[in-house]
Amino acid sequence: MTEPRLTQLEARRIALAAQGLDRRRPDRAPGARPPGVGDIRKALARTGLLQLDYVTVVGHAHEHVLFSRIGPYDTARLDDIAYRRREFTEQWAREASLVPVAWWPLLGPRRAEFRVRPWGFEATFNQLADYVERVVDEIRERGPLAAEDLDAPEGIERRMPGTWMRSVPRAVLETLFARGRLAVAHRRADRSRAFDLPERIVPDVHHERVLSREDAHRELLRHCARGVGVGTAADIADYVRMPIGDARPRIAELAESGSLEVVHVDGWREPAYLDPSARRPKRVDGCALLSPFDPAIWYRPRLARLFDFDYRFEIFVPEEKRKWGCYALPFLLGERLVARVDLKTERKDGCLRVRAAFLEDGAPRDEVAAELAAELRLLAGWLGLESVAVERRGNLATALRRATRG
């Protein structure tokens, strides 16, 4: 049987609709109700998960993902959904992520496999067995604790210089978390994690549900496919960084059962898989600056296939080797990525600074500048900044500077 065919543009529209980026955010008049918990839930239902990142070049990256979909919202409401209402929980999914609490059993194999393939801290961790159990007992008795609340093991240097874990107590907590013996109760004001027993965080219906490795992977990939809309096996697997060798058989089973539809996308070398419930809009009218960690663009090979857009996040690239800038964000207008801007918040001056602005080939300069200027003003206001300043670098800088002053 011949596979259904999609054009690149049709696939792009499906992908944007799957992420809730196919429509402009509602205009909110001054004094109108800001986006609330319901709006956040709807956006998260589209993305499925948020990859957590607390880099503060332009606010927190994962919070920006929601801003792109619902506009200026109170980030405390996201914390409320995750850490007080317990609708989401932190897990290692796509790196450190916020996932629906119902995904707890789906990530069970990943937690179990951490015991087989642990970090380099494993040898030290095994030597600290008594200390590890005391930590768990202390949390059981005292409630949620962070690394700063714990003493170091006797005779062991507390600090772990040169590692992101920074201290032995933190490394122990993080290892217990990755193995599923602890869960994140909340984030403190400094964004450090406080840990508790998972049975006090995850509802019994999810905590006690145990799935085989195959069933867990299959169900997890089904959720990933909804977020992707249409994509190759690699696109779907990357949504939660699942090894492709584990993902392919389960995706094939989903296709065999009718949970996914095999399609051919023009210009793609591999077959694609379509979520049968995906919306297939005839027209897309998006308008959003996208975080580097946005699910719509985080897998760069797929981004290139869908949008003909070459994107590299250059925050870790030496300055002299950067092409676009330290924190360049793609700008979605309509159904194209039409520009990219290198941004930086300057709290002291109350300014959102555009260090560079680049227009993509064939994009209408004046229209893009006007729409982007409005988006930058909205973003600046959400970040608590008073102004937008555009520097001279980039082929869109002059038009954008003029538009921001208009």
Per-region residue spans from a language model:
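Long, low-complexity intrinsically disordered regions
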Residues: 1-297, 302, 309-328, 333-406
